[in-house]
């Protein structure tokens, strides 16, 4: 009897696979983007070996498909991630992520005086890329922040 020491994440018949997520980011994506707000099966792989990243996370959601806009919002956290649409166990579409112009209802403004932190409004940021740096400008307080500052506020 041979023993295979390699564990594999089960293939899905139909749905979305988010691959090449940096390690330790998978759970954050599940929470921020409310990916668990479904009764469909979700498979999560954490700290999986990756030639490109060293370690990576992976999320598979059955019978659920992300729009291009939803997929691009993931780029703030996982710029090199790929979002694959699966049908009948085959990849039928691969989305390469790009930064969106706006991110709404996902991030929290780090400005403690911003109205979005105390009033029932959806957060909204415009995304600006200058010289390889990504900045986010809050729609409400109009302050601009380096993207890492906003990502850490969540």
Swiss-Prot record:
Organism: Serratia marcescens
Binding-site positions, Zn(2+): 109, 114, 138, 141
Its job: Involved in allosteric regulation of aspartate carbamoyltransferase.
Protein name according to UniProt: Aspartate carbamoyltransferase regulatory chain
GO aspect biological process, one term: pyrimidine nucleotide biosynthetic process
Cofactor remark: Binds 1 zinc ion per subunit.
Top-level taxonomic group: Bacteria
Alphabetized UniProt keyword annotations: Metal-binding, Pyrimidine biosynthesis, Zinc
Family statement: Belongs to the PyrI family.
KW ATP-binding (keyword) present: no
Summary of subunit composition and partner proteins: Heterododecamer (2C3:3R2) of six catalytic PyrB chains organized as two trimers (C3), and six regulatory PyrI chains organized as three dimers (R2).
InterPro entries: Asp_carbamoyltransf_reg_N (IPR020545), Asp_carbamoylTrfase_reg (IPR002801), Asp_carbamoyltrfase_reg_C (IPR020542), Asp_carbatrfase_reg_C_sf (IPR036792), Asp_carbatrfase_reg_N_sf (IPR036793)
GO cellular component labels: aspartate carbamoyltransferase complex
Cofactor: Zn(2+)
GO molecular function: metal ion binding
Protein encoded by which gene: pyrI
